[in-house]
């Protein structure tokens, strides 16, 4: 390869990092992180970023374009209900910028039956498609992945990413995002498997990781609807359903993930099934009993913790 061809190749490969570091992309990511963290504590680093954004933006751009940007360690924040791996405001902004550009590029490549991706209609669209078609099919199979985010294999994920991304600086950032370091109250650990929850880039990575499953279902010609790691298959015959289940198991084995034993079901559609918190039958949708049970349990915990009436009201309003 002569020098001119090599330079042209490098220029093409570097277009992606230029788009991520572009002023419009960083401004959109900045607006997003400001909105998401507008109610954070006054000691939160979001306020430092907001105060110094005019000076910090060109510095971030320069670091990205030189391949010198590195993500800091994540902190673990413990709440009464969960543990949250927390990115600093600046890292969250950069991850959002990467997500904005990659989503634009990958959206046409990802299955139209994957509904959790931005612009696909979300949970309501997934439920609507299942509800509209369930009456035309006799059998269903639904499942999801046990501990999906924590189970994602970095090597298998990046093998898929590298089919779409050639920019070495972006690939380096994505490896840095995956092989992160977590600070849990002074205990430090390196992460070698799984992706981060609560990260703006993770839903897109979660969509890409199961793309082989999406493609396999499309080839079978069954009705298939996926929302993140939760999906349902509708089939006209037992033979068609068995073939789909066999394909699902084969793809999950290749991706080194396992079905959740408590969220896997199959049978006749007339008996109904639980999907995304709703009970689905040919007659329509209603909130699943398990969803109501979780709501009651949450309200009980809030009462035990001495939550104010206004906080409980906010939770119930959000739940509805």
Question: What residues fall within each predicted segment?
Answer:
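Short, charged/polar, Gly/Pro-enriched secondary-structure boundary elements
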Residues: 240-244, 274-276, 282
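Conserved two-metal-ion catalytic palm core of "right-hand" nucleic acid polymerases
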Residues: 1-166, 170, 181-185
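Short acidic-glycine loop/turn motifs at beta-strand connectors
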Residues: 80-81, 236, 282-283
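Active-site and adjacent loop segments of nucleotide-processing enzymes
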Residues: 2, 276-320
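A generic secondary-structure boundary signal that marks alpha-helix termini
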Residues: 106-107, 257, 304
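Conserved polymerase palm-domain catalytic core
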Residues: 63-64, 71, 112-113, 118, ...
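A short local loop/turn or secondary-structure capping micro-motif enriched for an aromatic residue
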Residues: 94, 150-151, 243, 284-285, ...
């Amino acid at each position: 390869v002569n020098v001119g061809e090599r330079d042209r190749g490098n220029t093409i490969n570097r277009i992606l990092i230029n788009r991520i570091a572009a002023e419009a992309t960083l401004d959109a990511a900045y607006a997003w992180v400001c909105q998401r963290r507008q109610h954070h504590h006054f000691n939160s680093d979001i306020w430092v970023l907001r105060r110094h954004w005019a000076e910090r933006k060109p510095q971030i751009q320069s670091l990205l374009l030189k391949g010198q940007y590195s993500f800091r360690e994540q902190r673990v924040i413990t709440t009464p209900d969960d543990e949250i791996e927390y990115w600093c405001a600046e890292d969250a902004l950069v991850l959002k910028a990467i997500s904005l550009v990659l989503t634009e590029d990958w959206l046409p490549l990802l299955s139209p039956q994957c509904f959790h991706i931005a612009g696909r209609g979300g949970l309501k669209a997934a439920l609507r498609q299942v509800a509209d078609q369930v009456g035309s099919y006799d059998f269903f199979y639904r499942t999801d992945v046990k501990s999906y985010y924590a189970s994602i294999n970095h090597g298998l994920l990046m093998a898929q990413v590298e089919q779409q991304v050639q920019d070495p600086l972006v690939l380096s950032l994505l490896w840095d995002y995956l092989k992160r370091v977590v600070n849990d109250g002074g205990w430090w650990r390196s992460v070698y498997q799984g992706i981060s929850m609560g990260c703006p880039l993770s839903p897109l990575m979660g969509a890409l990781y199961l793309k082989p499953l999406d493609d396999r279902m499309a080839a079978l010609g069954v009705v298939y609807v996926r929302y993140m790691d939760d999906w349902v298959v509708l089939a006209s015959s037992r033979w068609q359903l068995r073939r789909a289940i066999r394909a699902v198991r084969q793809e999950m084995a290749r991706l080194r993930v396992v079905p959740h034993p408590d969220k896997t079901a199959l049978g006749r559609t007339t008996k109904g099934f639980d999907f995304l918190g709703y009970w689905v039958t040919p007659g329509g949708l209603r909130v699943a009993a398990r969803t109501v049970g979780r709501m009651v349990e949450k309200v009980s915990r809030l009462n035990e913790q001495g939550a104010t009436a206004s906080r409980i009201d906010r939770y119930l309003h959000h739940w509805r």
